[in-house]
Amino acid sequence: MTTLVVHGGAGRWAVSEEKRQAVKRALEDAVREGLAAMLRGGAVDGVVAAVEYMEASGLFNAGYGSVYALDGRVYMDAGIMDGKTGRAGAVAAVEGVKSAVRLARAVMELTDHVILAGEGATLLAKRLGLTAPFYKFYSEEKNRQFSQVLEEARQGKWHFKRVLDFADTVGAVALDKDGNLAAATSTGGVWLKLPGRVGDSPLPGAGFWAENGVGAFSATGVGEVIILSTLSLRARDLLEQTGDIRAAVEKAVEYVTRRFGPDTAGLIGVDARGRFAFSYNTRAMARGWGKPGEVRAEL
C-alpha cells in the first residue's frame, strides 16, 4: 500500500494559531507532493519531494527556515536512505544550499560516499546548481529569536532541551507500490551550536533508516541524544523482533526517555505493509500522513 508519513519536529509547538494552521497546511501539502512524486517514481522520490517542500516553506528548522549557529551563520544537515539498495547519502554542516535533502540524494546516487561535510558538500552543491543566495536563510523573526537565545545564554538560562522550544527538524518515510521503503531527514541543527557541530539527521541509524522488508524511520529531537541512542536503528531492530510498528517506535522512544529524560525525541515509522506510527516524549510533534486520495496532519 502506497503510504507516506512526514514530521515537522517534536517540541513544545507553543505558536500562534495562525502559524499552527500554516504548519498544518504545509504538512498536508508536503504529503501531497510526496505522494505525487511516488506515483511518478518511487519511495525515494516521495521522501525527497516531501522533505524538499518543507525545506522550501521556511516554516520549519530546515532549508530556508534553518536556525543560526553561534557565529550567526546557517549550517544544514540532511540524510536519505533507499531501503531497496541499502544505500544512504548525507551532507553535514553545509551552507547556502536550497535543498539539503536533494544534495544528500546526490551523494547517495552520484558518489561512492555516504557523508560529505562542510566545504566539500558545498562545492558539490555548486557543481549541481543547488546553491541559493545567503539572504534567503535570514529573516527578521529569526534575527529576533537569535537575540533572545543569545541573551538567555548570557544569563545561563540556555540548555539543550530548550532547543525544542524553537527547533523543528523535518523528515519523511515512505512505502511505494512496489514495496520499496525510503527515509529522509533534514535540519538546520540547534540554535547557538558551535560551527562544525553535526547532529543526528545525516547519520544512518540515528536520524533515519530504511530497509526493505522491515521498515523506514525518521527521528527528531535533541541530536546528541538521538545519536547516543541510535534511535532509528533501535526502532528497526524492535520492529524486526515484534512485527509491530507501533510497539517498535513507542519502545524506542521509551528507551530514550529512560536513558536521557523527557523532552528529547520523536520518531515516525512505516513498516513493509504500510502500517505507520509515531511516538514522542515532548509536548507535541507536528506530523502528517496519507495515501493517494487521503491526507491528514496534526500538531
From Swiss-Prot:
Family named by the database record: Belongs to the Ntn-hydrolase family.
Summary of pH dependence: Optimum pH is 6.5.
Source organism of this protein record: Pyrobaculum calidifontis (strain DSM 21063 / JCM 11548 / VA1)
Regulation acting on activity, per entry: Divalent metal ions and EDTA do not have significant effect on enzyme activity, indicating that activity is metal-independent.
GO BP of this protein: proteolysis
Free-text description of this protein's post-translational modifications in UniProt: Autocleaved. Generates the alpha and beta subunits. The N-terminal residue of the beta subunit is thought to be responsible for the nucleophile hydrolase activity.
InterPro entries: Ntn_hydrolases_N (IPR029055), Peptidase_T2 (IPR000246)
Protein name: Plant-type L-asparaginase
Record-linked Gene3D superfamilies: (Glycosyl)asparaginase
Temperature dependence, free-text field: Displays activity at a broad temperature range and is highly thermostable. Optimum temperature is at or above 100 degrees Celsius. Shows a half-life of more than 150 minutes at 100 degrees Celsius.
Reaction(s) catalysed (UniProt annotation): L-asparagine + H2O = L-aspartate + NH4(+)
Pfam families the record matches: Asparaginase_2
A single GO molecular function term of this UniProt record: peptidase activity
